[in-house]
């Protein structure tokens, strides 16, 4: 697969058509018998623990509502999400990144993590009140903030909004009231929409529509 001339769509189709081990299928079924909230299916690769190179966003993460009335359909959706995360090692962007950092893609080993999405459902939309990222070192401190005080970036809704580089609220956790921007600037550059899992659409297609299949953008009004 690594050095073949197959397109990623062909590789993805091969993964989706491949059966999962019976032991894994059994565990996924048992998991779904207990967990009924939306799920995040994401990667946990060896290279993602690398101290030398960032790997955030290189592989795919799939969000699924996990609310289809047919239990077998829920199982199928979860199994496909697992396959698709595994296959995301071989996307064009992943291969290009491995080449850019001069690493061997065949050295990667990946587990897949299945976990509940933190949040609540509001009018058919499932999302957390706050999501964000925090860093322990601030390269652009101001006033009496020190670099080691770090900073955080937060937004309403799913974390895809934050990691996608959209308009967010940035602050220092040690001095949360200290703001560099004026009130006018904050109002102009504030969040205008958010991402949530669409709980009203039970007929989404992960294979066809990718990571965005079950996620929608909603305006803030």
PLM features per residue range, with description:
Residues 1-13:
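Extended, well-ordered alpha-helical scaffold/bundle regions in very large, multi-domain proteins
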Residues 15-221:
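Conserved mixed alpha/beta core segments that line enzyme active sites in large multi-domain catalysts
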């Amino acid at each position: 697969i690594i050095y073949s001339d197959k397109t990623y769509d062909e590789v993805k189709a091969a993964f989706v058509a491949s059966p999962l081990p019976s032991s894994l299928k059994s565990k996924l079924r048992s998991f779904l018998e207990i967990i009924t909230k939306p799920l995040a299916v994401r990667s946990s690769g060896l290279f993602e623990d690398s101290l030398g190179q960032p790997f955030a966003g290189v592989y795919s993460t799939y969000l699924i509502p996990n609310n289809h009335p047919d239990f077998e359909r829920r199982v199928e959706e979860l199994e496909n999400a697992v396959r698709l995360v595994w296959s995301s090692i071989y996307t064009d962007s992943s291969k290009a990144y491995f080449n850019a950092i001069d690493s061997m893609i065949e050295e990667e080993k990946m587990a897949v993590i299945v976990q509940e999405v933190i949040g609540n459902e509001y009018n058919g939309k499932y999302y957390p009140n706050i999501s964000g990222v925090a860093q322990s070192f601030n390269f652009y401190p101001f006033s009496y903030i020190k670099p080691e005080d770090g900073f955080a970036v937060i937004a309403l809704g799913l974390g895809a909004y934050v990691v996608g580089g959209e308009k967010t609220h940035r602050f220092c956790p040690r001095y949360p009231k200290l703001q560099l921007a004026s009130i006018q600037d904050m109002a102009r550059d504030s969040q205008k929409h958010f991402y949530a899992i669409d709980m009203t659409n039970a007929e989404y297609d992960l294979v066809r529509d990718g990571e965005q299949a079950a996620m929608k953008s909603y305006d803030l009004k």
